């Protein structure tokens, strides 16, 4: 992301920011796990097992596939001497507790693979509960939407709202940055005023002052 007086972000990246800050989605107090209309397991889900957990949103399946969970972005674990982001290790431990030595169900996303070659999917436990929603409801990640993988977007937003309302996890003190504080790319929560919205062939862009 280029750094200038006007910062640009893709429409969906900006949508993540706006919804995280303004609370888009279901009203406060709704339990995402208890909402079958938004968090129910798709019929095409298939049984899988976890081999190992990389971080809060990525794991290795027993069949060798690397799985990136859809709809959640967890804090980054530090590498090459860099420190881990707050709650990164907590998110990893929580995912381990949910998936290790447990029968799981996997529903692939409409777009089933990312540019790193990882499988993209929705993961469910033996009771049919969304693993992503469970992590989000604990405040261990941010709900994100990247079309066309938006099947459980309402579920994930409801789960995040549950954590926000209770100020759980990273929502105890969310790291919201001003534009002047932004010094790197990647996922960030930003605050600013929308100056303009423009479009390109594959994306819309929001300029922030």
Region locations from a protein language model:
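Positively charged N-terminal leader segments that act as targeting/secretion signals
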Residues: 4-17
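Small beta-barrel nucleic-acid-binding modules, primarily SNase/OB-fold domains
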Residues: 2-3, 22-209
């Amino acid at each position: 992301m280029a750094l200038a007086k006007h910062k640009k972000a893709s429409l969906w990246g900006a949508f993540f920011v706006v919804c995280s800050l303004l609370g888009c989605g279901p009203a406060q107090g709704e339990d995402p796990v208890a909402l079958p209309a938004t968090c129910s397991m798709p019929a095409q889900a298939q049984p899988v097992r976890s081999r190992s957990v990389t971080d809060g949103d990525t794991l290795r399946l027993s069949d060798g596939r690397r799985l990136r969970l859809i709809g959640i972005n967890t804090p980054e674990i530090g590498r090459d001497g860099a420190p881990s982001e707050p709650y990164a290790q907590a998110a990893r431990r929580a995912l381990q507790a949910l998936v290790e030595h447990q029968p799981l169900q996997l529903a692939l996303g409409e777009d089933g693979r990312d540019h790193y070659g990882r499988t993209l999917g929705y993961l469910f436990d033996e009771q049919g509960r969304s693993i992503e929603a469970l992590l989000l409801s604990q405040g261990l990640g941010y709900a994100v939407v990247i079309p066309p993988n938006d099947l459980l977007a309402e579920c994930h937003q409801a789960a995040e709202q549950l954590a926000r309302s209770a100020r759980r996890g990273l929502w105890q003190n969310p790291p919201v940055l001003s534009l002047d504080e932004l010094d790197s790319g990647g996922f960030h929560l930003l605050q600013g005023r929308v100056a303009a919205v423009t479009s390109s062939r594959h994306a819309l862009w929001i300029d922030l002052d």
